[in-house]
Amino acid sequence: MSCKNLLFVFADQWRRMAMGCAGQDPVLTPRMDAFASKSMYCTDATSSFPLCSPHRASLFTGRWPQSTGMFTNCKPGLSVRLRDEEVCIGEVMKENGYRTAYIGKWHLDEPEINHSPEPLSGARDWDAYTPPGVRRHGFDYWYAYNTCDTHLTPHYWTDSPEPIRVEQWSPEHETDVAIRYLKDAAEKEQPFALFLPWNPPHSPYHYVPEQYRQLYKDLKFPVRENVDAEHLHYHTPEASKMTEEDLQQATRDYFAAVSGLDEQFGRLLDSLKELGLDENTIVVLTADHGDMMGSHGLMAKHVWYEESIGIPMIVGGAGIPQGTCGKVIGSADVAPTLLELLDLPVPDTMEGRSAAKELLTGAACEDSFTYLYACPGGLALLEPLQKAGIDPKSMGWRGIRSKRYTYIVDAGYAPDSPMQRLLYDLQQDPMQQAPQKLRRAAECPEAEVLEGYLAEWLEREHDPFLPKLNKESSVL
């Protein structure tokens, strides 16, 4: 093989802090830490839309949510999926001679129950069998499901609607399948691109093998000073039913799942080395978004705090130097970055900015930033907006994450939601507990600059949120 291979591993709902080498959460990840020590460790990788489907759409297309149309998750009751005409990284790699493979969670297809109460595939709830063809967007080898969170009893589809049911923790099983694929790839001259998306540590948190749970049975709390266990809720006003003890156990299980992923990642690295593929394979380890785990009284994702938007990213192997990359890398930046690292053409459709140069040099990139985006997507939130004649894509929040600041313009999720502008200084206030609240961006020079960047982006993307920037915020 003369061309470089790609192994792209990403977990669901895994925050940047939850890795030993990050020096924050008390999580055990020796294999990941060792990989980071000889690779390029990205300090500011960011999920631009911290939700599964929207991030994945940007990841594969190199485009922002306004362009992909992915304003929420693919879910029952909504006709939302990755459009057939989108040009994805899998298609680009296939057209340039790569064998392409996808093993694990997809979550870019529409649930089958939107069209049939009893799908032939047996898919239920949010799940779907994605048949061979354009909806796989260039991936030839397919061992996947749309979305289902039964981590200990997963199922998959290949090229028929007959599901493959498994009694094994999903990351372990998917790693088994990936290693078999690598063994086959080692015997071929053709370069490969293998994408391996693990679902854990996504909730339900307790679906994790007992040997990993035992690692954290004596863990003391709180693990972060901004955790508020008394008023837990989600990004909507919906309250969580978790007690403080529930949160403690969920956090233990969350870390346990990450330690389990660490073991599986080590198995992958060992296989690459044993098969003689390690020196010619770029390996990327990352996630689609993080998890609040009680910080600011919040659970899950879909908010602008670092626990939600901050994702791990380590890039190593095949000519990638050891070091630290300080560039703020957003969701849409990943595809053009990978293509440039592999010396492949970047389609004109891709809107993200390649970080290949910074990954190869370890540049600090003090002036780098990415855009942030979120819309209301739950059916209970969409109905009042529809009744009021309001486009849900004009609501939610938009923002900028730069090296030092996170700047947010929040219009809320309801027709009568108050506007707010928030500026977080991540150097002075890393736990984001004391934002500067502004009526207008002009009240603060830093906010004025960042809102200028935001306005240019919203105008370029024809985002219906843009007129909100002309309104004065009412929350102080």
Sequence positions of predicted segments:
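Formylglycine-dependent sulfatase
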Residues: M1-D410, P415-M419, M431-E456, D463-L476
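Residues forming the ATP-binding cleft of Hanks-type serine/threonine protein kinase domains
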Residues: Q427
